Amino acid sequence: MLEFDTITAIATVLGEGGISIIRISGENSLSIANSIFRGKNHRDLLDIKPYSMRYGFIIEKDTGEILDEVLVSFMKGPKSYTAEDIVEINCHGGVLATRKVMEEVIKAGARLAEPGEFTKRAFLNGRIDLSQAEAVIDIIRAKSHISVKSAVQQSQGKISKEINLLREELLEIIAHIEATVNYPEEDLEEMTSDQIYLKINKILDEINYILSNAEEGKIVREGLSVVIVGKPNVGKSSLLNSLIEENKAIVTDIPGTTRDVIEEYMNIGGIPIKIVDTAGIRKTDDIVEKIGVEKSKEKIDESDLVILMLDSSKELDEEDKEIINYVNHRKYIILLNKTDIGDKIDLNDICNLNSRFIIKTSIKNGEGLDKIKNCIKELFFKGEIKSEDLFITNTRHKEGLIRAKESCIEALQTLKSTLSIDLVSIDIKNAWINLGKITGDTLEEDIIDKIFSQFCLGK
């Protein structure tokens, strides 16, 4: 284990609450806490058993004045979060009380931790790898139970295990090639080009399989952005209200009521969905409405999915067709709304659209909402979302896999173009290095520092 100084930070949100927790980690954590602690019957902390708590008071070292009534816990390294000795002081919640205790800890010899420094120490001390460390921040920022489960699985090493298996397979090929080339006099079983080709191809298939869920992984982590578009008064705001089951958007019979973008959140099958209700798209001389229309188009370009609403009680006009052409290059669902009062849209006019994603609805009567939700799941998750699936939720991990994939493809091409198998080891090493960047084994120190700087204090 590496040697570090002793650090401290407030591990809970600073504000009014039942308790605040001040975390101290490092070789001197227990002696620092003990120097400002007074236990019942004057007991100190030096004989505290690991993984137990002791009741007492934090005192101001200079005056002996009691600052707060506390419970102190002790976790002995390496069986702790950072793999170092950790002390946690549970004091009363509140900004002033917490800060006073924190000041005494720093006066006693601890240094204020940098953002993410506790988790960084867990990584540097070998308790977790980098992908597991990144999962910690994903757990904190998770927006749904699926994203929490996925992040917890990653923190337990689910991704690391897969990556390490791939690296072991690559390393085995490298070792065999180099042993064959460098020690020809030894009686080693020679690995032929065909054997290497088959092994690399197998690894490539495994990488492709992991990458196949990368888009779903991004959605699990960040959620979906869904934009509702259409002409004014087609039912966009009614749809938003129905989906979130609240009356957040104003609904009137007056076209152009919604002039700005309205954003709300809902959940479909455990996935967070940001629903964006936009201003009706039409030609207008109203300056404010024009700005709203431009914002609508911006939101379409930023979205993962467009829900285009058409009024089925009226025939399509040029404005409808213009909107259809605008969204046709994106993932979309077409809602033929107001079917309760008419069905005048000729389906031949929208025959260039995928009929699987055309839904007849009457939002006023609550018809078609389940179809919309099922369609979203079909578009992005092939109909079902399973928390036990292996999701690549991190863009950095995805990039590492793509680079490793490219190196494997180059290795296969090298094998096809040359009879010398030692040349292929360069490409295989590159694949091994790129996969190692995911777990942090081969990543540059400045990038590691940048990753941990995104964490909150106390974590």
From Swiss-Prot:
Sequence positions that bind (6S)-5-formyl-5,6,7,8-tetrahydrofolate: R23, E88, R127, K459
Cofactor: how and how many bound: Binds 1 potassium ion per subunit.
Official protein name in the record: tRNA modification GTPase MnmE
Gene3D superfamilies: P-loop containing nucleotide triphosphate hydrolases, Probable tRNA modification gtpase trme, domain 1, tRNA modification GTPase MnmE domain 2
Domain of life: Bacteria
Pfam families associated with the record: MMR_HSR1 (PF01926), MnmE_helical (PF12631), TrmE_N (PF10396)
SUPFAM superfamilies registered for this protein in UniProt: P-loop containing nucleoside triphosphate hydrolases, TrmE connector domain
Coiled coil: none
GO MF terms held by the record: GTP binding; GTPase activity; metal ion binding
Binding, Mg(2+): S237, T258
Organism expressing this protein natively: Clostridium kluyveri (strain ATCC 8527 / DSM 555 / NBRC 12016 / NCIMB 10680 / K1)
Gene Ontology biological process terms in this record: tRNA methylation; tRNA wobble uridine modification
Binding-site residues for GTP, renumbered to this chain: 233-238, 252-258, 277-280
